[in-house]
């Protein structure tokens, strides 16, 4: 999962994610964050919220088809986002109500043991393809890794 902060003329941000089962890409989605966020961390939190909804749906489909699922992993390259999403409710601070609601949704699913965030270094964050222009070798490396089913981050 990746988000790009304030990249449009109207101050909006983008998010994107790749959905994999094993090492196979089975879905992807990207889009514009509808509200203006005030930091890259808030953009990432909103993006994680979008991913959470999609992952819960995909997990339910797999369970319904008879494939029991462990916790779903979400790769994140923003340490501040990871820290905020793992913060206990009494310590979470934000002035943005919409960010607090999105944080609460992730926390709810995390506390059920369904979702888990992990740090993924930016240089192997394949979702960058959906959120920002990549040049030359970086683009080709991500594209090749996705096509070959290399281990990747969401």
Language-model segments: which ranges?
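RNase H-like nuclease fold core
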Residues: 1-41
């Amino acid at each position: 999962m990746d988000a790009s902060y304030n990249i449009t003329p109207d101050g909006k941000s983008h998010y994107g994610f790749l959905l994999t089962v094993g090492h196979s890409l089975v879905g992807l989605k990207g889009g514009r964050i509808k509200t203006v966020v005030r930091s890259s961390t808030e953009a990432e939190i909103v993006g994680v919220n979008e991913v959470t909804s999609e992952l819960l749906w995909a997990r339910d489909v797999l369970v319904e088809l008879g494939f029991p699922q462990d916790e779903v992993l979400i790769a994140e390259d923003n340490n501040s986002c990871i820290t905020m999403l793992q913060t206990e409710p009494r310590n979470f601070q934000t002035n943005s109500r919409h960010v607090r609601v999105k944080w609460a949704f992730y926390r709810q699913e995390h506390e059920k043991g369904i979702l888990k965030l992990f740090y993924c270094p930016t240089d192997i964050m394949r979702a960058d393809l959906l959120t920002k222009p990549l040049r030359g070798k970086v683009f080709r490396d991500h594209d090749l890794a996705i096509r070959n089913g290399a281990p990747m981050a969401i």
